[in-house]
Curated annotation (Swiss-Prot):
In young, mature and senescent leaves. Signal peptide: none annotated. GO terms for biological process: defense response to bacterium; induced systemic resistance; regulation of jasmonic acid mediated signaling pathway; response to bacterium. It comes from Arabidopsis thaliana (Mouse-ear cress). This is Probable WRKY transcription factor 11. Residues 240-306 bind DNA. Gene3D superfamilies: WRKY domain. Transcription factor. Interacts specifically with the W box (5'-(T)TGAC[CT]-3'), a frequently occurring elicitor-responsive cis-acting element. Regulates rhizobacterium B.cereus AR156-induced systemic resistance (ISR) to P.syringae pv. tomato DC3000, probably by activating the jasmonic acid (JA)- signaling pathway. Belongs to the WRKY group II-d family. Induction: Strongly during leaf senescence. Repressed by rhizobacterium B.cereus AR156 in leaves, and to a lower extent, by P.fluorescens WCS417r. Keywords: DNA-binding, Jasmonic acid signaling pathway, Nucleus, Plant defense, Transcription, Transcription regulation. Transmembrane segments: none annotated. GO terms for molecular function: calmodulin binding; DNA-binding transcription factor activity; transcription cis-regulatory region binding. The gene is WRKY11.
Amino acid sequence: MAVDLMRFPKIDDQTAIQEAASQGLQSMEHLIRVLSNRPEQQHNVDCSEITDFTVSKFKTVISLLNRTGHARFRRGPVHSTSSAASQKLQSQIVKNTQPEAPIVRTTTNHPQIVPPPSSVTLDFSKPSIFGTKAKSAELEFSKENFSVSLNSSFMSSAITGDGSVSNGKIFLASAPLQPVNSSGKPPLAGHPYRKRCLEHEHSESFSGKVSGSAYGKCHCKKSRKNRMKRTVRVPAISAKIADIPPDEYSWRKYGQKPIKGSPHPRGYYKCSTFRGCPARKHVERALDDPAMLIVTYEGEHRHNQSAMQENISSSGINDLVFASA
């Protein structure tokens, strides 16, 4: 190994590596050919010499690759074969391993002419619209890539909703396909479609979807409106929390909540004059003057004073009837 390297002291390392590697590969190919031939043809060639020559060339390549700037070389054992025999063997290997001229077949690839994008017309008045040789609507499918030609306007119009119907024909304009998510769901549209029940279909104060319950109840979401608020200060009639000054309506307490920074809670009342009245009020003590009450009214009453009087009179008549009975 070291002897072969010392023979070329002035050759560049890269050139020496390439030469040694090529000679080793050629000798290895020659050895493979010899071993693959018939047994009666192997007695003329000594496989051991070819193997030694191949191994020596690969060792030379390894030594050249591992060598550094100040490497030291040791003289290896001298091979018993003479230099003339090695040169003769090398010439024989080169002669047998000359590559044959490869047959090159040139194929001319004609570029495909892509027609300009055009609109697709579908005529539903005719029995058959898609033929096997239709040129206007041709879809190109491949195993690895799925590509749709200019006739993808049908799919794009089906997705984007572009298209017009006239005299039994649909004219579809070509448009790019919208991307689809990996989960298979279409992207969220800017204007979501919402179904309303028939009762609130044209109402602006209701929004939402129709519930699928069997009872057929309306579950439309009511839009929150700003309620009318009115605040008044009235004197307290007693120190009890439940005692509030009366007014022209009847109220029923439905809850209370503590107030931060005040020892007195806030009471919540709703109108009990008529069932379903949306009017509410809450009463709390004033922080600056505990003898005053702050009453805040919310919402409007859905009844008038005449209806209240009729309700009171009817309730009085019923009491008299029950008393006489």
